[in-house]
């Protein structure tokens, strides 16, 4: 293998996962002069793939294998791959819960939150499925977290909480969601209240309040939730009662003006 090809491989190796833009940037410090993408692919990337030092995950996305790794035994890193699909993104919902170490179950899906202009088709790589979730705001309450030699963009704990309650289908359903959230440490409830109220969704404050009320009874990580905090949600409740789960026999929780499925809390306790 040519020396420059080997030098490019060594430059990419710490990344473990690289998009083609990463490869072009690394190549600019290895080769002399400038080169277009087709040339870099044909001259270097293709050779590294043939030498089993790069694995193509999808078009424009590659795994970099260490000298001791075998292609047939390669175990992909779901979070690292998800972080390289788009430049403007964040890992959210159940994927964020997994990052924070509180997810009740490990999912094969990775939820990559992007603006609709950055959409991509869902794809599978080995046992993992990578899915876009379309979000208008991809910058508020997003934090960069070190992950190996990389940085991941992840929704803050507070935004993760709100979004999981708001779109529970991306958090694994109510049982998985609640069991995961009860292990979410270090939640700043005041930071959670503000974005909830500013979203302007009529049903969201009552759902957030209801689940904070449940969680402070279930988890030591929510013992700091006070009635004063909950009252900020309570005074925002407007309009007719809403159903937490449609199509199920439910009873009205008058405090939160929310129809809750019968035996819902008992079922959660039995998880």
Language model features with spans:
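Short beta-edge/loop segments at beta->alpha junctions of small alpha/beta modules
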Residues: 1-88, 185-201, 212-213
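Short coil/turn segments at secondary-structure boundaries
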Residues: 23, 59-60, 109-111, 174-177
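A general structural signal for short secondary-structure junctions and capping/turn motifs
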Residues: 46, 54, 101-104, 121-122, ...
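Residues in well-ordered beta-strands of folded domains
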Residues: 63, 111-113, 131-133, 246, ...
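Positively charged, aromatic-accented nucleic-acid-binding surfaces
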Residues: 78-85, 94-97, 155, 233-236
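Exposed, interaction-prone assembly regions rather than primary DNA-binding/catalytic cores
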Residues: 92-145
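Hydrophobic alpha-helical interaction segments
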Residues: 143-271
